[in-house]
UniProtKB/Swiss-Prot annotation:
<keyword id="KW-0443">Lipid metabolism</keyword>
<dbReference type="GO" id="GO:0006633">
    <property type="term" value="P:fatty acid biosynthetic process"/>
</dbReference>
<protein>
    <recommendedName>
        <fullName>Holo-[acyl-carrier-protein] synthase</fullName>
        <ecNumber>2.7.8.7</ecNumber>
    </recommendedName>
</protein>
<feature type="binding site">
    <location>
        <position position="8"/>
    </location>
    <ligand>
        <name>Mg(2+)</name>
    </ligand>
</feature>
<keyword id="KW-0275">Fatty acid biosynthesis</keyword>
<keyword id="KW-0963">Cytoplasm</keyword>
<dbReference type="GO" id="GO:0000287">
    <property type="term" value="F:magnesium ion binding"/>
</dbReference>
<keyword id="KW-0460">Magnesium</keyword>
<keyword id="KW-0808">Transferase</keyword>
<dbReference type="GO" id="GO:0005737">
    <property type="term" value="C:cytoplasm"/>
</dbReference>
<feature type="binding site">
    <location>
        <position position="57"/>
    </location>
    <ligand>
        <name>Mg(2+)</name>
    </ligand>
</feature>
<dbReference type="InterPro" id="IPR008278">
    <property type="entry name" value="4-PPantetheinyl_Trfase_dom"/>
</dbReference>
<dbReference type="InterPro" id="IPR037143">
    <property type="entry name" value="4-PPantetheinyl_Trfase_dom_sf"/>
</dbReference>
<dbReference type="Pfam" id="PF01648">
    <property type="entry name" value="ACPS"/>
</dbReference>
<comment type="similarity">
    <text>Belongs to the P-Pant transferase superfamily. AcpS family.</text>
</comment>
<keyword id="KW-0276">Fatty acid metabolism</keyword>
<comment type="function">
    <text>Transfers the 4'-phosphopantetheine moiety from coenzyme A to a Ser of acyl-carrier-protein.</text>
</comment>
Amino acid sequence: MTLGIGNDIIEIERIQANIKKYGQRFLNRVFTKNEQIYCLNRKMPALHLAGRFAAKEAVVKALGTGFSQGISWLDVEILNDANGKPYVSISPLLTQLFASPKLLISISHCHHYATAFAVWSS
C-alpha cells in the first residue's frame, strides 16, 4: 500500500553555484561521503549531485516531514546498486521514526534540470 509520494525538480546550475560559492562546506552539509565519491568521479558531477539533491527532497516529502523533526540532509543517502539503479539508505533516526520504511525512487536529468520521484510503501 502506498503511504506517501514526493517529487522534486532542481536547476542543475543551482547546485553548481552552491559548489562554487560554498565548496566542500556545501557538499558536506548536503551529501554523504559515499554520495560525494560517486558524484564527484562522474563526467558531470553537478548533474549527479542535483539528482541526489532532488531525490532527498522527494523522499522527505513522501514521508511527510520535510527536513524537520531533527531530520537532516545526511539522514537520507542515495546510492546505486550493481546495475546502477538508485536506492535509498536511511539513518537510524528515520528507521526509528518510520519503522523501517520501504522507499522507492526514480531520478532523471537533462541539460538544465534534475528531477526525482519517491514512493513510500508498506
